[in-house]
């Protein structure tokens, strides 16, 4: 009687392992970029949260109001998130009136200074995204940004 052997040969298993290794070589860097982009987006969310504070400061004719003072009820000009710190900066320019002009107010976002700074992607740690606020209230990437272009969210990316 002839016995039938069923299963995979060693060479077939080695080929499968090699294919998985090749796929992983492409997938891991792409996944790391995806994580860095998602963490970078948190900074823009923090900046959006500062829009109300900027508007309140602009009523006094300035971008950056007083530092936080809980005793007097003054809210500060910075927000800390999980991966980033966003701070209001700049000098208000009242002469700018067109909706697409920067009004002089900026938000500086520094990555790696959040509450979970040890968990941030090494691709964006210590990098800075500067956002200029436009007269219409939206943000656009400003000068002084050293965050790699591929990690800057499209909503604020400067047109080139």
Swiss-Prot record:
SUPFAM superfamilies in alphabetical order: Pili subunits
Transmembrane segments: 8-28
Propeptide residue interval(s): 1-7
Signal peptide residue numbers: none
Keywords: Fimbrium, Membrane, Methylation, Transmembrane, Transmembrane helix
Protein's cellular compartments: Fimbrium; Membrane
Primary location: other
PANTHER family assigned to the protein according to its UniProt record, in alphabetical order: GENERAL SECRETION PATHWAY PROTEIN G, PREPILIN PEPTIDASE-DEPENDENT PROTEIN D
NCBIfam families xrefs: IV_pilin_GFxxxE
Name of the featured protein: Fimbrial protein
Source organism of this protein record: Dichelobacter nodosus
Lineage of the species this protein comes from: Bacteria, Pseudomonadati, Pseudomonadota, Gammaproteobacteria, Cardiobacteriales
């Amino acid at each position: 009687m002839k016995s039938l052997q069923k299963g995979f040969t060693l060479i077939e298993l080695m080929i499968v392992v090699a294919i998985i290794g090749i796929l992983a070589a492409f997938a891991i860097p792409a996944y790391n970029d995806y994580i860095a982009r998602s963490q970078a987006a948190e900074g823009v969310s923090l900046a959006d949260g500062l829009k109300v504070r900027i508007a309140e400061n602009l009523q006094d004719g300035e971008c950056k109001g007083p530092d936080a003072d809980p005793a007097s009820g003054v809210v500060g000009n910075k927000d800390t998130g999980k991966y980033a710190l966003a701070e209001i900066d700049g000098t208000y320019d009242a002469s700018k009136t067109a909706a697409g002009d920067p009004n002089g107010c900026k938000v500086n976002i520094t990555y790696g200074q959040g509450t979970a700074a040890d968990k941030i992607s090494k691709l964006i740690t210590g990098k800075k995204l500067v956002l200029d606020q436009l007269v219409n209230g939206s943000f656009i990437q400003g000068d002084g940004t050293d965050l790699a272009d591929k990690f800057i969210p499209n909503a604020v990316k400067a047109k080139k």
